[in-house]
């Protein structure tokens, strides 16, 4: 989570100052896309991620949900195959194997979002939480990063507003 430092006097001294064209905070879909494109154009880029490369999409959201949907679709086809002249059967779901499938799909995509790949593209990756210490400086992992531009790509959280009938 990105938070503004309100206790400047308590800020520890960082070990290294890194000056770049772009500092990208968040290594989900948006942050990774921007970092790769900027590096491809020869820009100096630092990418800060406090948790997992690939963000929620790769690790918890888009990719795992699509892998689960694919498994469910196969089960549905087994149940509804009569219209194609195939005797339908009730599938036996092995939850552990489905979970393994989901993990395999994540693992097959993860190298595209990895620290190693982005380092190879010329992006400096810092695995730590980032926080602004002033309007032109972010601190992360013992480093102070100054940049021409900051890209905040930390994602979002869904909010379900109360409708006073079914959600309070």
Where do the language-model regions lie?
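Glycine-rich flavin
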Residues: 1-20, 29, 36-43, 48-168
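Class I SAM-dependent methyltransferase core
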Residues: 26
